[in-house]
């Protein structure tokens, strides 16, 4: 049930969930979500609140459990991480052709003050280069960062 979060993170999320769960039944209802949104200065119509809950409510009971709450946070974090990976890839892919080459990696690292040998640079590309074409495409770049 940890979703890859540390014990400390789960405890933090549980505390936040408990603040939303006013009646302490282990679920966030439409009414409780509405109260939270009002506290945040957003007075959403009930249909919008129900739509929001339905996006997170994986078991279809019309409420958000702590497990569903964690799943939503996990999806958000993964989406955020994917955006960060895309941004880094785009910086390394200096000519914008969708690939990182040894030369682009060398240029990028030298701008950061890193000086690696040609062999070290080629090894870095080789580790990520699943299809062995001598360059790293975005999917390979993501796989490298997800697996490590």
From Swiss-Prot:
Keyword Thylakoid attributed: no
Q: Which domain of life is it from?
A: Eukaryota
Q: What is the lineage of its organism?
A: Eukaryota, Metazoa, Chordata, Craniata, Vertebrata
Q: Which residues bind Ca(2+) 1?
A: 21, 23, 25, 27, 32
Report domain EF-hand positions.
8-43, 44-79, 80-115, 116-148
Q: What does this protein do?
A: Implicated in the early stage of ectopic ossification.
> Could you tell me which PANTHER family the record lists for this protein?
EF-HAND SUPERFAMILY PROTEIN, MYOSIN LIGHT CHAIN 1, 3
The record's section on CDD domains has: EFh
- Kindly provide the name given to this protein in its UniProt entry: Calmodulin-4
Keyword Calcium recorded: yes
Which InterPro entries did the record assign? CALM/Myosin/TropC-like (IPR050230), EF-hand-dom_pair (IPR011992), EF_Hand_1_Ca_BS (IPR018247), EF_hand_dom (IPR002048)
Q: GO biological process: any one?
A: cellular response to leukemia inhibitory factor
The entry's keywords: Calcium, Metal-binding, Repeat
Q: Which Pfam families match?
A: EF-hand_7 (PF13499)
Q: Which residues bind Ca(2+) 3?
A: 93, 95, 97, 99, 104
